[in-house]
Amino acid sequence: MFVKVLATTLFALAVLHTFAVKKFAQWAHHYPQGSLQENLLHFLAETEIVFGLWASVMFFAYAAAHRSIHHAVEYIENQLDFTEPKFVLVVMVVAATRPVVQLAERMILSVARLLPLKETVSFFIATLAFGSLLGSFITEPAAMTLLAMLLKDRYFDRGISRPLAYATIGLLFVNVSIGGTLTHFAAPPVLMVASKWNWGFWHMLSNFGWRSAAACFVSTLIVTAIFCRQLNSLQLPDASRRFIPTWLTGLHVACLAAVVYFSHYPDVFFGVFMLFLGLVTATREYQDSLKLKEGLLVGFFLAGLVVFSKLQAWWLEPLIQNMNGSMLYYGATALTAITDNAALTLLGSQVPNLSDELKFALLARSEEHTSELQSPDHLVCRLLLEKK
């Protein structure tokens, strides 16, 4: 019990740390640039490393509690499964490459041209309504990264107003979050629990998917109506794109499809990833810089959650089992304001014999809300708002 209480305490400290990152960044400016104190405080101010950092503290605390480093190693190696963090790392890097991004842009542009509106308006609708649903197939982190790159090029780099910028960011986060629920293998909150709860494709589509798709379209139309005048006033970007051979785009799509297909087999999809890195190196004239840093940070973030999750069942089980569907639904609403939705569903999956009603309430509410503490969202926000 001591180890479980310790794990919960460290998990709570990690959550509190996420709220203090801005303060650490401010303190860092009080020290000379390049000094130990300045670098340490900047390190502590990185949101994406918070849960991984505290997970490393948990590792050594676990070893100290058992008076053996081997017990801690055994816990990491044999009691935890890091397949999902590894998968998210790989799929984010593969999906954010120039051939895949340009293919997605052409697909979205084809949908946009079906709408009898100016392209700056129709592309906005197609990206945030139709594009958000891509997260159900190429995964939520990949779709988030890909759509952010398209929106940055066509809107954020063209001096849109702050209200439109923040409305677009919020709409992107929510739509991609709920748009990943058409399938059982794409969104991290679903991916973390689908196999344990035996939720397949048809279950997700019939219970969550159609509702999510409808919500994406309605919310996008509302935001578009509010900012229609500003979207109409924007100038079209330069339509020219650097040539990419069809065969190379096909190979990239094949690699992405293979990674998704083998998502439950880390040794296999990492092998595909190694081949992909070789392909990118050999065809560097058609490539942009890989988003390795972003993928690694998100993977590290999710891995930290995995380390903590297994030791939280002792307090979650009695808490959740004493709730009905409505109580859990609104409780999850409050929790997603301060923690990651993948963490919430992962923690909930540790409770045995959870009813179908409670499972639905937990996933529905955690997918419906996003918080500023979610690492993929935080990175995308930084990408969109940085200067060109």
Model-derived segments and spans:
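Membrane-interfacial helix-loop connectors
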Residues: G135, P141, T145-N175, P188-N207, ...
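Short "domain-exit" segments at the C-terminal end of structured domains
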Residues: E372-K388
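Hydrophobic mid-bilayer segments of alpha-helices in multi-pass membrane transport proteins
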Residues: V5-K23, E46-H66, D81-A95, L146, ...
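Juxtamembrane and boundary regions of transmembrane helices in multi-pass small-molecule transporters
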Residues: V3-H30, L103, P163-Y166, G170, ...
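Transmembrane helical segments that form the transport core of multi-pass membrane transport proteins
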Residues: A65-E77, V101-E105, L251-L354
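Interfacial loop-to-helix junctions that mark the boundaries of transmembrane helices
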Residues: M1-K4, L40-E48, H70-K86, F201-R211, ...
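Flexible interhelical linker loops that connect adjacent transmembrane helices
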Residues: L36, R113, I226-T249, R284-K293
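Helix-loop-helix module between adjacent transmembrane segments
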Residues: M92-R98, K118-E119, F130-A142, V174-T183, ...
